[in-house]
Amino acid sequence: MPRAKKEDIFYTLLKDFAARIEDAAVEYVKVITDFPETTSEIPQMKVYENKCDEKVKHIMEELYSSFVTPIERSDINDLALAMDDIVDYMNAIASGLDLFNVNEMRKEGPQMANLTLTAVKDIHVMIDHLPDYKKDTLVMEKAIAVGHIEDEGDLVYQNALRRLFLEEPNGRYTVTWTRLFDQMENLLDACDNTAGVVRSVVLKSA
């Protein structure tokens, strides 16, 4: 296979992966925002997770068999795994709502979910423009934007826990919601970790 074509396969796979993650994020926001009416849609998040696992497997197979890669081999590996973490956390959060018998959504849930969707959309654009990362400033702009979104999420997370402990210091859902909010915060961290890999790629080429 010609060198250019072989290198392009990684960008194609990563772009497709980013698109699937955005699809999952749209479903995730719907599940969180309209919960508990969306309880029946929670299993769909596992479907997205499985599909994304296949994307990672394909990327790793190509990585193993390729002599030439468009960016460092370790960066492609780290990027694929970081992107996979995003969907893993979405599924864990959605499944947790069912597992812990949650019957009411707290207001910070949709706030953090929408921040996640915004971050994922930025990641999608970032990955779409990644082939031109040495010249296209939008790559770094989106990577930095994701970091700012994660900072916003930290504030929502802190306020969510503060309100939870104030209103239900000994309530039955305190432990449950602490865990769920932790995972929501970890989800935004996963988005920033993904952007962080790209920030590193761009800086190494500067």
Stretch-by-stretch model annotation:
Residues 1-206:
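Cytosolic, long alpha-helical scaffolding segments
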